[in-house]
Design a protein with these regions (language model features):
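Conserved redox-active cysteine motifs that mediate thiol-disulfide chemistry
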Residues: 69, 77-94
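Bacterial N-terminal signal peptides that target proteins for export
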Residues: 2-12
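N-proximal helix/coil linker or "cap" segments that precede and/or mark the start of modular domains
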Residues: 20-54
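Structural microenvironment flanking redox-active thiols in thiol-disulfide oxidoreductases
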Residues: 86-129, 142-144
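Thiol/disulfide oxidoreductase modules built on the thioredoxin-like
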Residues: 125-131, 139-183
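Bacterial N-terminal signal peptides
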Residues: 11-20
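Hydrophobic beta-strand anchors of alpha/beta hydrolase catalytic cores
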Residues: 74-75, 110
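A short beta-strand-turn-helix
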Residues: 44-73
Length: 187
């Protein structure tokens, strides 16, 4: 017969295992997506703007990153009230403009995910700090959680199969170097 103290330890261990196994935590348990990882299938709400849906090449109310026709996707996780994201916005608007005016047009696409943001908050954000590229809502942080709950801004460069080719935490300061990196990653 087991001693009561040993039974309690075993019971606590079993409870801990079940809690970890069934906590609903998905995505990266050990951190953020890294180069070489494949992103989970994220079902995202389509942007409200017809122009943004046309740019992404999507027609439905929801889509997955793999539905976007491009060779490389810049996928930026932002926060509606994130001051660093506000600082990065004009830099990425410049990057978007350079991509769209050059030979990379159509080959590289850009998309932002507003972690915790709903459609009304995105409209507020766009009134404060215009973005040249689409922003999609993630009001319940579902996609954000699947991505390991990164601090914002968090930028990923992803191929059409969802393979992560590069990640960057924080503001991308050197747009020229980042554009070169992106150009080098496009087959």
């Amino acid at each position: 017969m087991m001693k009561p103290a040993r039974q309690i330890v075993i019971l606590i261990a079993i409870i801990a295992l079940f809690t970890a196994a069934f906590s609903g935590k998905t995505g990266w348990c050990g951190g953020l997506p890294q180069k070489g990882d494949t992103l989970p299938s994220l079902e995202l709400e389509a942007p409200s703007s017809d122009k943004d849906r046309a740019y992404l090449g999507i027609t439905g109310q929801t889509f997955r990153l793999g539905d976007i026709r491009c060779r490389l996707l810049l996928f930026e996780v932002i926060g509606i009230y994130c001051p660093q994201c506000y600082r990065q916005a004009p830099l990425f608007n410049t990057l978007f403009s350079r991509i769209e005016k050059g030979k990379l047009q159509g080959r590289i696409k850009m998309l932002a995910l507003a972690a915790g943001g709903n459609v009304a908050e995105i409209q507020y954000l766009l009134a404060q700090r215009p973005y040249s590229f689409p922003i999609v809502p993630d009001p319940a942080f579902e996609a954000h959680k699947l991505l390991g709950e990164p601090r914002t801004p968090f930028t990923l460069l992803v191929d059409p199969q969802g393979k992560v080719l590069h990640t960057h935490k924080g503001v991308v300061e050197d747009i020229d170097a980042f554009l070169k990196l992106m150009t080098d990653l496009v087959p």
